[in-house]
């Protein structure tokens, strides 16, 4: 897997950023926080799950997603967004 696959679209980056800020989110919360439509989010979430970057849990009809921080790639993504969050605060 190439890093380009993970960061191949602004939509995926928005989803990963939101998931790095929260422990777990359902699709409705991701839609609200990213401004992306439900269909686009579903497509990106499916791909990110296939890549092993995020994990899906199902509770009946509810689907919850989280960044897999125990995976080295997920941990690196979390650190990347945390680093940029710190830089953004300094630049303000």
List each language-model region with its residue ranges.
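Key DNA-contact positions within bacterial/archaeal DNA-binding proteins
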Residues: 39
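Short alpha-helical segments that sit at the start of domains
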Residues: 1-14
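Short capping segments at the starts of secondary-structure elements
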Residues: 22-26
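A short, conserved structural fragment
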Residues: 49-59
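Residues within the DNA-recognition helix of helix-turn-helix
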Residues: 44
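Amphipathic alpha-helical dimerization/coiled-coil segments
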Residues: 69-92
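A short acidic, leucine-rich amphipathic alpha-helix
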Residues: 29-32
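Short, Lys/Arg-rich nucleic-acid/phosphate-binding segment
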Residues: 58-64, 70
